[in-house]
Amino acid sequence: MTTTPTTRNARQAKILEILDRTRVTSQVQLSELLLDEGIDITQATLSRDLDELGAKKVKRDGGRSFYVVGGELEQFEDQLNGPREKLRRMLDELVVSHDFSGNIAMLRTPAGAAQYLASFIDRVGLPDVVGCIAGDDTIFVLAREGLGGRELAEKLTSRGI
C-alpha cells in the first residue's frame, strides 16, 4: 500500500469518516485503518488530530471503550433528534465557506470532506434539497423550485434545517 501526503483537513475528515462508521478502540487501530486508506500518520499527529476534533473515548454497557467525536451526550442527542441534528453538527464542523447562484447553494469544505458531507445531506432527505454534487472540497446543493440558492445556503449554514 502506497501512502500519499494529505493535508491536515483531509486527514481529519477521513478520521471523522472512520469514527462514524467503525467502533475504534485504540489509536493503533485507527492508525491501521488510516493506513488502509493510504494515510500514514505518526502517533503524535494522530493524538493531536483526535484532540483537535474533540474525540473522546466512551464505554457503553460495560463493553470496551471506543472513540466518538463529541462524546456520549451527542450520541444520546442523536438517538433523540435523529439524523438532522447530526447533519447540523457536520455542517458546523465541515463547512468553511458558502456561496450561491440561482437555485444552487455552494458549500466549501476541507479537502477530502465534500463527498462525505454531500452523501449525508442526500441520505437525510431534506425537503428543500433536490440533491447534491460533490468534488473534493466543494458541494453544489440544488434547491427545490421556489427556494433560491441564497436561502438554502443560509439554512444549511445557520442551523435552520
Curated annotation (Swiss-Prot):
Q: InterPro entries in the record, alphabetically?
A: Arg_repress, Arg_repress_C, Arg_repress_C_sf, Arg_repress_DNA-bd, WH-like_DNA-bd_sf, WH_DNA-bd_sf
Q: What's any one GO cellular component for it?
A: cytoplasm
Q: Which GO terms describe its molecular function?
A: arginine binding; DNA binding; DNA-binding transcription factor activity
The alphabetized UniProt keywords are: Amino-acid biosynthesis, Arginine biosynthesis, Cytoplasm, DNA-binding, Repressor, Transcription, Transcription regulation
Is Amino-acid biosynthesis among this UniProt entry's keywords?
yes
Where found in the cell? Cytoplasm
Picking any one GO biological process from the record gives:
regulation of arginine biosynthetic process
Pathway in which this enzyme or protein is active = Amino-acid biosynthesis; L-arginine biosynthesis [regulation]
Q: What does this protein do?
A: Regulates arginine biosynthesis genes.
Q: Note the NCBIfam families from the entry.
A: PRK03341.1 (NF002880)
Family under the similarity heading: Belongs to the ArgR family.
Q: What is this protein called?
A: Arginine repressor
- The gene from which this protein is expressed is argR
